[in-house]
Curated annotation (Swiss-Prot):
Its main location: membrane. One of its GO terms (molecular function) is ubiquitin protein ligase activity. Zn(2+) 3 binds at C746, C749, H774, C776. Zn(2+) 1 binds at C708, C711, C722, C725. A zinc finger (C4-type) spans 707-729. It comes from Danio rerio (Zebrafish). Gene3D superfamilies: YVTN repeat-like/Quinoprotein amine dehydrogenase (2.130.10.10). Catalytic component of the GATOR2 complex, a multiprotein complex that acts as an activator of the amino acid-sensing branch of the mTORC1 signaling pathway. The GATOR2 complex indirectly activates mTORC1 through the inhibition of the GATOR1 subcomplex. GATOR2 probably acts as an E3 ubiquitin-protein ligase toward GATOR1. In the presence of abundant amino acids, the GATOR2 complex mediates ubiquitination of the NPRL2 core component of the GATOR1 complex, leading to GATOR1 inactivation. In the absence of amino acids, GATOR2 is inhibited, activating the GATOR1 complex. The gene is wdr24. One of its GO terms (biological process) is positive regulation of macroautophagy. PANTHER family: GATOR COMPLEX PROTEIN WDR24 (PTHR46200:SF1). Signal peptide: none annotated. InterPro entries: WD40/YVTN_repeat-like_dom_sf, WD40_repeat_CS, WD40_repeat_dom_sf, WD40_rpt, WDR24. It holds the Pfam family WD40. This is GATOR2 complex protein WDR24.
Length: 779
């Protein structure tokens, strides 16, 4: 009666409120009337009323901002309504007492962790016990009546992602780790964990004990899996596995529903899903209100399955009502379709759809529920809905692809093996990858690589870049001279190489003398002269001259033919002048009479050594469209192209794309490479990645579980002796001692030993040192 009374008092609807900043975590109080929202820049308490959320208290007080307010997690005590705990990004664990009369509600500060604290958890029945897990790999248990931790737990592993006290076992808590392991601890024994098992491939981000079933523990990881483990037996057993759409950041069991749990993702997917673990491939319900990553979920009351609270990076706080959730099952296609790794197609449907009627008379015939027409229908009991669901059978058809079919995945393998991602200049990488895509009949990808080379290649002559400014007086250069002969030759050379699409003019030198100013140019049959950028094509003049010996008379060119230009202030149609900051050349009165140019000095007139404008747009100009292109490829499922371009472009585009999105692309591509057993390519992608979570994939420790060679029992991690037969494992066949370093064995007879001992033995004899008579060979 007490439970029903508490549930009946909870009323509400689907509602939301805007927050001041993105939320990292949320927690609800015991009576489900208030919720606390914590993040890097927010720490507030909101009241839950029928009309909406009402701000009750802002816990970020003080003139100077403190990192103690920058929260990675928050927990509201379920026995003491005025007590909260937060995990700070600076490694501090802070408790808050809402009953304090002053504005600052901070009560205790624990600074024993050296890195960010990821999780804090109160004991469900012990008021003064608080547990924390940190990036430093340690878990600490605090007694709130003391100023220091009472015990420290070292998992001998990487960072701790989540810690949860068991709802049924007073002394037990579970911890999930970055390396994919889950450990069970007894708070009375801080020296060693009680049990450890590998739950996921990759980090385990979250875990949650079932509120009713004593031994059920749900875990979620980066491998997009939610797994339910049975801890009540001597050996950990996986009983359910749910395949989600993205990495699982939070998992919470649904109250009053044994097989339901809620999950949210830490990247890509913004929705909240409620799963029935008995039907793991399609969500039972979906909440689609958030526009960015959901960071925290909590059921409003421990006995109410109809209200779910959530916070997100979109700076919103939502209360979801279960009747407003969308039901994917209602819209789902009852037939299944799936492509295999090598292009094979599998199709599953009900047997009634896959098999044709036996005869024409069977069409439209209805059968009795019991299936036997010898008895009246009232003798048969209508089957339960769950039984009907369990008894449904499907037929599976597999269509194998031909070897030369376009549906095959040979193009993926050949592309992964042929692409160059590093080791050469950027232009050569793009050109090589374009040829690879073209040879594999992928014209769109080939064109993409070619366009990337054009957009992001640097000019061949760095002196003609756009990093030049106006001179001090603000004047534009008077004349820019081009040698068409040299330009044509350069273009022909570039067309042969097919490497550059830029037009570079001949760089000239400006020499200043005391008496006059002369400009040396290159020889040519024709010189095209234009002043600034204001002349049209029909205003260009061609001046021809013949190469004459140096000893002939000089050409006298009147200065008044080229009057000095006035200062140009602002001209919207003219490009930005590209002249270095220096004073404009000044022509004195005596120098204004004439200027002397010799034939050997060409017919180039007063000019500058830089172009008026660069033929290249800055690379940042193309970043938005390249970002859209990468997202397009990823949405189409071609993560190979997205990741390859991301690696080749490097810092040119990396900052434009969200790091979590990059991590999702990398993980998807690496997963595909490993499915095709392209281990070398996978390792290269990991090494070239700039995401921290990806770079550490090939640096994680590798655990090899071995069995006893005598009784075949799995070896424990307590030593090198089998617990059952008391025989040593991995004994060297030569020296008969336990091998604790490099171990080499024969694949024919399975005998082996120390690497050095086996090498020395096989130099003298070809027979196995164990005496089995096998002819062993060391290669």
């Amino acid at each position: 009666m007490e439970k029903m009374t508490r549930v009946s008092t909870i009323n509400g609807r689907t509602m939301f409120c805007h927050l001041d900043a993105p939320a990292n975590a949320i927690s609800v109080c015991r009576d489900a009337t208030q919720v606390v929202v914590a993040g890097r820049n927010i720490f507030k308490i909101y009241g839950l009323e029928e009309d909406g959320f009402v701000e009750r208290l802002n816990l970020r007080v003080g003139r100077k901002p403190s990192l103690n307010f920058s929260c990675a997690d928050v927990m509201w005590h379920q026995m003491e309504e005025n007590l909260l705990a937060t995990a700070a990004t600076n490694g501090a664990v802070v408790t808050w007492n809402l009953s304090r009369p002053c504005r600052n509600k901070q009560e205790q500060l624990f600074t024993e962790h050296k890195r960010t604290v990821n999780k804090v958890c109160f004991h469900p029945t012990e008021v003064n016990m608080l547990l924390s897990g940190s990036q430093d790999g340690f878990m600490k248990c605090f007694d709130l009546r003391k100023k220091e931790s009472v015990s420290t737990f070292s998992g001998q592993s990487e960072s701790v992602r989540d810690v949860q006290f068991s709802m049924k076992d007073y002394f037990t808590f579970a911890a999930s780790f970055e390396n994919g392991n889950v450990q069970l601890w007894d708070i009375r024994r801080p020296d060693r964990y009680e049990r450890m098992f590998t739950a996921h491939t990759g980090p385990v981000f979250c875990c949650d004990w079932h509120p009713e079933d004593r031994g059920w523990l749900a875990t979620g990881g980066r491998d997009k899996m939610v797994k339910v483990w049975d801890m009540s037996t001597n050996r950990v057993k996986e009983i359910y596995c749910v395949q989600t759409f993205a990495s699982v950041a939070r998992v919470k069991w649904r109250p009053e529903r044994r097989y339901h749990l809620a999950t949210c993702s830490m990247m890509v997917d913004h929705n909240i899903y409620v799963w029935d673990v008995r039907r793991p491939f399609i969500p039972f319900a979906t909440f689609e209100e958030h526009k960015d990553v959901t960071t925290g979920i909590v059921w409003r009351h421990q006995h109410d399955p109809y209200f779910l609270l959530s916070g997100s990076k979109d700076s919103t706080l939502y209360q979801h009502m279960f009747k407003d959730a969308s039901r994917p099952v209602d819209r789902a296609n009852p037939e299944g379709l799936c492509f295999g790794l090598f292009g094979d197609l599998a199709f599953a449907a009900k047997e009634s759809l896959m098999s044709a009627p036996a005869s024409a008379g069977d069409v439209g015939r209805k059968t009795y529920p019991g299936g036997d027409r010898r008895y009246p229908i009232f003798f048969f009991k209508k089957p339960d809905v769950t039984e009907q669901f369990a008894q449904v059978s499907s037929a599976l058809s597999v269509f194998e692809s031909e070897a030369d079919s376009s549906a095959g995945m040979d193009w993926f393998i050949n592309t992964a093996q042929s692409y160059l991602l590093s080791g050469k200049p950027f232009a050569e990488l793009c050109e090589h990858n374009a040829h690879v895509a073209k040879s594999l009949n992928r014209p769109q990808e080939s064109t993409t690589w070619t366009m990337l080379r054009i957009m992001f290649s640097e000019p061949a002559n760095p002196s003609l870049s756009t990093n030049h400014n106006l001179n001090k007086s603000g004047n534009l250069p008077l004349v820019n001279s081009f040698s068409m002969k040299e330009m044509s030759g350069a273009l022909n050379e570039r067309n042969k190489e097919n490497r550059q699409d830029n037009i570079h003019s001949l760089e000239t030198n400006l020499n200043n003398n005391d008496e006059n100013e002369e400009t040396e140019g290159s020889e040519g049959q024709a010189e095209y002269l234009f002043v600034d950028d204001e002349l049209d094509d029909d205003e260009l003049y061609s001046m021809e001259h013949d190469n004459q010996p140096a000893e002939e008379s000089e050409y006298l060119l009147p200065q008044e033919a080229f009057p000095l230009r006035h200062e140009i202030m602002d001209h919207p149609s003219a490009p930005e002048p590209l002249q270095e900051k220096q004073e404009s050349p000044h022509v004195s009165g005596s120098e204004a009479e004439s200027m002397c140019l010799t034939p050997m000095e060409s017919f180039s007139l007063i000019s500058v050594s830089q172009q008026l404008f660069s033929p290249h747009l800055p690379p940042k100009f193309f970043c938005p469209i390249v970002k859209e292109m990468l997202c397009y490829y990823a949405e189409q499922g071609d993560v190979q192209m997205a990741v390859s371009v991301l690696i080749v472009l490097g810092d040119r585009i990396r900052k434009e794309i969200d790091e979590l999105m990059q991590e999702h692309w990398y993980m998807s591509y690496i997963d595909l490479l490993q499915r095709f057993e392209l281990w070398n390519v996978s390792n290269e992608v990991i090494k070239l990645s700039t995401c921290g979570a990806i770079m550490c994939l090939n640096q994680a420790s590798t655990t090899l579980h071995i069995n006893c060679s005598n009784c075949k029992r799995p070896m424990s991690n307590k030593g090198w002796i089998c617990d059952r037969c008391h025989q040593c494992a991995s004994v060297c066949a030569v020296c008969h001692h336990v091998v604790k370093g490099l171990f080499v064995w024969c694949q024919g007879c399975s005998h082996g030993g120390h690497l050095e001992h086996v090498m020395e033995w096989l130099k003298q004899s070809k027979h196995c040192p164990a005496g089995c008579g096998h002819l062993c060979e060391y290669t």
